[in-house]
Amino acid sequence: MLSYDGAAGYPFRVAGTRVCALLGCDLKGRSFSALFAPDSRREIEDIIAVVSEEMLAAVAGITATSQDGAPAHLELLLLPFNARAHTPLSLTGLLAPFGGGHSVLRDFKLTSWRYLGHQPQKTVPRALRKMAIARGFMVYEGPR
């Protein structure tokens, strides 16, 4: 789970055991965008912004470098996470390697990405929806 805080580099709020093992350390509080090579940082930050602000899911292909210099291919799924109104924006997701047996990974690079879903419908409270439909002069019947 990532916090939507661009100034801090979108830090991890919580990270699972497998993700921490892939990166060789506990990720809580560490910057997500700092995992990426400098030439991919801006792109991943743009993807995070689209997922959070437009409430769209994103799937990305990532290539990382292992400790022995071999490339490792991963898949990233980012989903908007908005539990309640007036709570901080955050994201949840999945980072999974293709194949296994990778040592600690570094220097992530985006190879591809796409957005899933459609523009969500804005939900308006029911009372306001009724008022948007009602136009002009209205007569309400009262008790007789």
Can you say where each PLM-predicted feature lies in the sequence?
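Sensory/regulatory domains in signal-transduction proteins
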Residues: 1-115, 144
